[in-house]
Amino acid sequence: MPDYRRIAAELGRTPESTVFSIEDSDYDSGGWASFIAIRLACRGAEPEIRDGYQVTRYASVVICRIAPLAALMKVVEAGVALDGKGSFSKLPVADDLVSAVPWDTRQRIPEILANYGYQILAPEIGRLRLPDGLGVDTLLTSKDEKDCYIGHHVFDAWFHWMD
């Protein structure tokens, strides 16, 4: 298994980005999803205080745990309550796929991911719908049943599969 912290550290050393957080994506369920989200903020950008929250704008580099695949997500916001009693963020979804992080003007992110053997999922591929009834064997199903991806996207199959 790759050392995601090393990838995050290298992404954070680019001139344009700093690592905001690394999320293991367990959906608060005790299980693990099949991705790691490395949240990148634009270097030099300050968090904003708004409505009792410290709000940070970030873009995610989402790394698949089950295949050498990564995805780039659009800029969104996460916040932590100033009193420490709450937070908010956004789960990566297919509609948020982008081909580049806006402040990565030198295109270092794809280069770093390629050095670790990851290919970036193109947004137009990630947004394709899977055929209804497509079944996938998982550890969560018996040998006679399959998890079905009804109405899901290619992105969902690679990055939201519960392992």
PLM regions and their residue ranges:
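Extended, charge-biased low-complexity segments
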Residues: 1-126
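Acidic, proline/glycine-rich low-complexity IDRs
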Residues: 113-163
